[in-house]
């Protein structure tokens, strides 16, 4: 009888195991052009890349929130407040790192946009 229960137990454990999707951070490969030298087309292309990166960071944030909530829910009553806070902090740290990288790129781009506008003829 035990030999029959073991396979069913393994199947039940596998089905009940929470499936955590691994949230993959965006790849930050956007090159910010030199606004004093760049053409309008180059600046527009960089802006488009930054907008796409912003969307990727937003998607990453949403994935992290879903994964965090699933992990906390899977812990159920076995998690105390400290354990829940630790899980939340891990996901917050990952999210903040991505947002900080995006912010640095956006800030640099904004400086280069000012340089680009400054070189344009006044009319």
Region spans (language model):
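Compact alpha-helical subdomains of small soluble proteins
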Residues: 67-123
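N-terminal signal peptide c-region/cleavage motif recognized by signal peptidases
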Residues: 7, 11-18
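Positively charged n-region of N-terminal signal peptides that target proteins for export
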Residues: 1-7
């Amino acid at each position: 009888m035990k030999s029959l229960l073991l396979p069913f137990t393994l199947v039940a454990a596998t089905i009940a195991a929470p499936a955590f999707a691994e949230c993959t951070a965006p790849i930050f490969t956007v090159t910010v052009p030199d606004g004093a030298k760049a053409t309008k087309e180059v600046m527009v292309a960089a802006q488009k890349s930054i907008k796409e990166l912003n969307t990727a960071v937003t998607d990453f944030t949403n994935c992290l929130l879903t994964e965090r909530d699933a992990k906390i829910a899977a812990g159920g009553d076995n998690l105390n407040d400290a354990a829940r806070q630790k899980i939340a902090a891990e996901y917050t740290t990952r999210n903040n790192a991505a947002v900080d990288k995006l912010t640095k790129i956006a800030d640099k781009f904004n400086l280069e946009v000012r340089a680009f506008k400054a070189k344009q003829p006044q009319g």
